[in-house]
Amino acid sequence: MERFIENAMYASRWLLAPIYFGLSLGLLALALKFFQEVIHLLPSVFSMAESELILVLLSLIDMALVGGLLVMVMISGYENFVSQLDIDDNKEKLNWLGTMDSSSLKMKVAASIVAISSIHLLRIFMDAKNVDPQHLMWYVIIHMTFVVSAFAMGYLDKVTKH
């Protein structure tokens, strides 16, 4: 009975595979949205104000960071919890494949969230005159919460490894 339960629990990790594949569909949706923004940007690039262009570019950077986060979670999560990726030797291989454990993945995710939050906050600051000061304060508080959380996670990870 114990062996059956252990085998069933171990096999249940495969339930994560469609979830990680679903993230690739989310990445596809993000890529479509990215290029939709680029297509909207190109015809009006010469007529828009510099600050407006910067806001659009920050939005594109934001999407790129989220895309990188999706790839990182999708691939390293699959490798850590489901199965090793069997990539042909003749194909281009990401240098971090097989090296990111769940602890380093958490740190990369935390750093990505802080970067995404920073971009979002910068976009808000560029339009600060149209943002309620109360909302602005909460944006900063939430961002600082992300920063402090990432720092605390890094510190705790360093302390527990040594």
From Swiss-Prot:
Taxonomic superkingdom: Bacteria
InterPro entries: UPF0114, UPF0114_bac
Membrane topology per record: Multi-pass membrane protein
Coiled-coil intervals: none
Cell membrane in keyword set: yes
Annotated family: Belongs to the UPF0114 family.
Family matches, as HAMAP family: UPF0114 (MF_00143)
Protein's recorded name: UPF0114 protein PFLU_5318
Organism in which the protein naturally occurs: Pseudomonas fluorescens (strain SBW25)
Organism placement in taxonomy: Bacteria, Pseudomonadati, Pseudomonadota, Gammaproteobacteria, Pseudomonadales
